[in-house]
Design a protein with these regions (language model features):
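Transmembrane beta-barrel domains of Gram-negative outer membranes and organellar outer membranes
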Residues: 16-162, 170-246
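Active-site cleft segment of glycoside hydrolase catalytic domains centered on the general acid/base Glu
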Residues: 165
Length: 246
C-alpha cells in the first residue's frame, strides 16, 4: 500500500502553470501476524492516474492484491475472514479530490483539503475487501525549514459496516520530514498513527523511511521500508513506486 507520506510528497513540487496528467505504478509487500499468531502476507500493486488543474487534483487508484491468510487488507483495514489460504484479484478502487487551499506563496506553507471514496470493487467473498463503500476526509500540510520540509496529515475515515460487524470510524495522523541528500535525491521519515477500528483491535503505529530519486523531468522513483509497532501494523513492509509525468 502507498504510505500516507506518498500523497504529501507529491504536493511538495511547485504548482504547474497548466493542466498536468501523471501516472504511477507501485509494488508493496507486507508481512505480519496482526496479533493472531498466523502470518499474513500482502502483495499490493496499484496503478494510479492523477490529473491536476489549477488548485484541484483528482486521482484514481486501481490495485491488484495477493493475500496469504487474509486477516487485514491494505492500510490495515479489517477483512471478513473465512477464506482460503491464498486469495488474489482486483482490489478496491479509491478516488480522491484535493483542493490546494495554500500553494506555498503564503509563508511557504502548503495546505491541502482532501476527500476520498473507496469503491468496493474487490471481491468480499475472496476476502479482498469488505464489499462496502468507505469515505475519508483529511488535511495535509507542509512547510520548508531551510533544506528540510516538514509535513503532517490529520484525517478521519468512515467505514461501511458489514451486516455482522460494527466498525469504529477512526481518526488518523502522520508526521514526518524530507530533505535532499544528493543531486535529485530526497530522503526522509514519517510516523503514522490511527485509532483502532474494532473494539478488540489495536491502533496503527508505524515508522516509514523513504528515498525519492528524480530520474528525469518526466520520471521519478520512490523506495520505502516500514516497521510496525502494534498488532494492527505489519511487522515489516517495503515497496517502490515509479512515477511518470506527461
Amino acid at each position: 500500500m502507498l504510505p500516507l507520506f506518498a500523497s504529501l510528497l507529491a504536493s511538495f513540487t511547485v504548482q504547474a502553470s497548466g493542466d498536468t496528467f501523471s501516472t504511477a505504478i507501485g509494488m508493496d509487500y507486507s508481512s505480519g501476524d496482526y496479533g493472531t499468531g498466523t502470518t499474513s502476507e500482502i502483495w499490493y500493486v496499484p496503478v494510479v492516474g492523477k490529473y491536476e488543474t489549477g488548485p484541484m487534483t483528482y486521482k484514481v487508484t486501481v490495485p491488484w492484491l495477493r493475500i496469504t491468510n487474509p486477516e487485514v487488507g491494505p492500510n490495515g483495514d479489517p477483512l471478513p475472514g473465512g477464506c482460503r489460504d491464498v486469495e488474489s484479484g482486483l482490489g478496491d478502487t479509491v478516488t480522491s479530490a484535493d483542493y490546494a487551499l495554500l500553494d506555498g506563496s503564503e509563508g511557504g506553507v502548503l495546505l491541502d483539503l482532501i476527500g476520498k471514496v473507496k469503491f468496493p470493487t474487490a471481491d468480499e467473498d475472496q476476502c479482498l475487501g469488505t464489499g462496502e463503500f468507505d469515505y475519508t476526509a483529511q488535511v495535509d500540510i507542509a512547510k520548508a525549514f531551510g533544506s528540510v520540509t516538514g509535513f503532517a496529515t490529520l484525517g478521519w475515515k468512515k467505514f461501511g459496516d458489514l451486516p455482522d460487524s460494527n466498525f469504529d470510524d477512526p481518526i488518523f495522523a502522520s508526521l514526518g520530514f524530507a530533505m535532499p541528500v544528493a543531486v535529485r535525491t530526497t530522503a526522509g521519515a514519517s510516523y503514522d498513527w490511527r485509532q483502532k477500528v474494532v473494539s478488540t483491535g489495536s491502533q496503527i503505529q508505524e515508522l516509514t523511511l523513504f528515498v525519492t530519486h528524480k530520474l528525469s523531468h518526466e520520471w521519478k522513483i520512490q523506495l520505502y521500508v516500514v516497521k510496525g509497532f502494534s498488532d494492527a501494523s505489519p511487522d515489516a513492509e517495503g515497496g517502490l513506486v515509479l512515477y511518470h509525468m506527461f
